[in-house]
Each structure stands twice: as structure tokens, then as C-alpha cells.
Amino acid sequence: VVGGKPAKLGAWPWMVALGF
């Protein structure tokens, strides 16, 4: 869980946002 969002549900959005 990253930023309070399950990786399975928000993987790409936060990965792209964080630069991963």
C-alpha cells in the first residue's frame, strides 16, 4: 500500500507520479 492506495488498484498512476 502506497499513499493509502493498494498497489493492485493504483499501481501505474502512483508509480508514474513518483517516477518509478
UniProtKB/Swiss-Prot annotation:
Enzyme Commission numbers on file: 3.4.21.-
Principal place of residence: secreted
Keyword Cytoplasm: no
GO biological process: proteolysis
Residue ranges of the TM segments: none
Tissue: Expressed by the venom duct.
Keyword field: Allergen, Disulfide bond, Glycoprotein, Hydrolase, Protease, Secreted, Serine protease
Enzyme class: hydrolase
InterPro entries attached to this UniProt entry: Peptidase_S1_PA (IPR009003), Peptidase_S1_PA_chymotrypsin (IPR043504)
Gene3D superfamilies with a match to the protein in the record: Trypsin-like serine proteases
GO MF, one annotated term: serine-type peptidase activity
Localization per Swiss-Prot or TrEMBL: Secreted
One CC-aspect GO term: extracellular region
Signal peptide: none
Record PTM text: Contains 3 disulfide bonds. N-glycosylated.
Record-stated family: Belongs to the peptidase S1 family.
Name under which the protein is recorded: Venom protease
Species of provenance: Bombus terrestris (Buff-tailed bumblebee)
